[in-house]
Amino acid sequence: MKRAPAFLSAEEVQDHLRSSSLLIPPLEAALANFSKGPDGGVMQPVRTVVPVAKHRGFLGVMPAYSAAEDALTTKLVTFYEGHSNTAVPSHQASVLLFDPSNGSLLAVMDGNVITAKRTAAVSAIATKLLKPPGSDVLCILGAGVQAYSHYEIFTEQFSFKEVRMWNRTRENAEKFASTVQGDVRVCSSVQEAVTGADVIITVTMATEPILFGEWVKPGAHINAVGASRPDWRELDDELMRQAVLYVDSREAALKESGDVLLSGADIFAELGEVISGAKPAHCEKTTVFKSLGMAVEDLVAAKLVYDSWSSGK
């Protein structure tokens, strides 16, 4: 008799994925495998996006198979622009995990925790490779879910002497600063927040540039995480063109990233190519990691959650 799939709530996913740092080793391996092409055993098309124009929304479908994990997943994610000030989150996601040997559905799990934690973990990987030596100042632009997940892993993995925060709505920035462990300086402007920062994380809902090259310290590293549509951007032309540009996926960046497409910036390497040693990490230069998020990242996290849940049954 066929077994019914497991349904794992956000709380259950959180229980089995308490620290984003757990994801770093398997994500490094998965990113390297992805960038090896067919030889790496990762089958992952660029996400399919269905506009829901009537309601200012989108549905994204993100399937992947990884031979290394022998795992098959797809994530369904929705994004609705007008929900930033309502009780309904702007982003909602579910991850489906299948038995790759026969196609049976093993589990349906909340994808919001997975998305937040795997995105932050990949940013941490990029930062470990690309940040300048002696990085003391971290700046986070944006105060939403991704700001919290990035702060968590960045304060676990690195030893910054100062953390700065800016958000368009100052009240949310102050709430962030009072909620997290550790001291966070709330800044009144993006320029104030980023001036002299060694590592900058942009996790905003911006559709036009908010971070300008003239404000950025030479040699700084930027993780650009927001602006996941081809007509949206967070970084200006000057910054995109003067920095060495790294991406998670060339194919996806050239289809989905307004920061890349609208600036005409050249992509130097995928993050997986740096991990494998195929391309260098230019820590001495200003670097940008444009993160769009990939299905294989969800796969790694979902497999880890499911294996942990299964072992505890």
Swiss-Prot record:
Enzyme nomenclature, EC number: 1.5.1.25, 1.5.1.1
The principal location of this protein is cytoplasm
Q: Supply the alphabetized keyword list.
A: Cytoplasm, NAD, NADP, Oxidoreductase
Keyword Cytoplasm appears in the UniProt entry: yes
The entry's cellular-component GO terms read:
cytosol; mitochondrion; nucleus
Q: Where in the cell is it found?
A: Cytoplasm
Task: Please give the Gene Ontology molecular function terms for this protein.
Answer: hormone binding; NADP binding; protein homodimerization activity; thiomorpholine-carboxylate dehydrogenase activity; thyroid hormone binding; transcription corepressor activity
Pfam families per the UniProt record, alphabetical: OCD_Mu_crystall
The UniProt catalytic activity note for this protein reads: L-pipecolate + NADP(+) = Delta(1)-piperideine-2-carboxylate + NADPH + H(+); L-pipecolate + NAD(+) = Delta(1)-piperideine-2-carboxylate + NADH + H(+); L-proline + NADP(+) = 1-pyrroline-2-carboxylate + NADPH + H(+); L-proline + NAD(+) = 1-pyrroline-2-carboxylate + NADH + H(+)
InterPro entries in the record, alphabetically? NAD(P)-bd_dom_sf, ODC_Mu_crystall, ODC_N
* Tissue expression profile of the protein: Expressed in the spiral ligament of the cochlea (at protein level).
Which Gene Ontology terms describe the biological processes this protein takes part in?
Answer: negative regulation of transcription by RNA polymerase II; sensory perception of sound; thyroid hormone metabolic process; thyroid hormone transport
Question: Which residues are involved in binding 3,3',5-triiodo-L-thyronine?
Answer: 47, 256
Which positions are annotated as binding NADPH?
Answer: 90-91, 118, 143, 145-146, 167-169, 172, 204-205, 225, 291
Gene3D superfamilies in the record: NAD(P)-binding Rossmann-like Domain (3.40.50.720), ornithine cyclodeaminase, domain 1 (3.30.1780.10)
UniProt keyword NAD present:
yes
Function of the molecule: Catalyzes the NAD(P)H-dependent reduction of imine double bonds of a number of cyclic ketimine substrates, including sulfur-containing cyclic ketimines. Under physiological conditions, it efficiently catalyzes delta(1)-piperideine-2-carboxylate (P2C) and delta(1)-pyrroline-2-carboxylate (Pyr2C) reduction, suggesting a central role in lysine and glutamate metabolism. Additional substrates are delta(2)-thiazoline-2-carboxylate (T2C), 3,4-dehydrothiomorpholine-3-carboxylate (AECK), and (R)-lanthionine ketimine (LK) that is reduced at very low rate compared to other substrates.
- Entry's family note: Belongs to the ornithine cyclodeaminase/mu-crystallin family.
Assembly behavior? Homodimer. Binds the thyroid hormone triiodothyronine (T3); T3 binding inhibits enzymatic activity.
Can you name this protein? Answer: Ketimine reductase mu-crystallin
Name of the gene: Crym
